[in-house]
Amino acid sequence: MLIDTHAHVNFKAFENDFDEVIKRSLGEDVWMINVGSKYETSKKAVEIAQNYNNGVFAAIGLHPIHAQDEEFDKERYKKLALSGSEWSDKVVAIGEIGLDKFKDYGSFLKEQKEVFLKQLDLAKELNLPIIIHCRMAHEDLIKELRIKNYELRIRGVIHCFTGTWEEAKKYLDLGFYIGINGIIYKRDLKEVIKKAPLEKILIETDCPYLTPPQAESERNEPIFVRYIAKDIARIKGIDFKTVSQTTFQNAIDLFNL
């Protein structure tokens, strides 16, 4: 069993065949968490999760790059998470949320921080973990998390980690998991993968983006998360089964699946 802990089958790239993609993944024992980036994609993630008895879950949240063009309405997101008992066990995290200073996004970092802190409060209120997006903003993010972690006892994962081992260690010391995906084929993360405890690693695709080259496909899919697991096993010098079993259990533990 494998879990793609960060997928976007709820995005437009899958609008014509998301059911086929999901059934293909479930048929190969690959579960998934579809992650929202705005209210509409969050709603879509929940609606998709509703259609499956098991193996398909949702995360809801406002991505930092949208902090300027969409107002975060806490009550609206809360209602989305709690609308009916059949939904509440499908929404397993608040995300993806965080900070992004790439290109011009840093020009509204203040608004990003305000939205981020509001979503931390929502996660605490709903007793849900968070899925964090961080790009070129580790110092700012770690500072915010250290302040709020003491107050809120936040738990979660740093999605698509691209930082140094020193930065990874700071997140690990705060109790966070490290999310590893196809970015490993573009960035050298061998030191992070070698040194991070397997018990604190989650695997993901970020599909439809960051397709592993082995997949020989333009569009990434949850089923390709197996390539990430195989390369983690190779880098750590352990067997694939250990990686799949441990990261599966890690996801169960963090997201209470």
Question: Residue locations for each model-derived region?
Answer:
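Mid-domain alpha/beta scaffold segments of enzyme catalytic cores
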Residues: 1-257
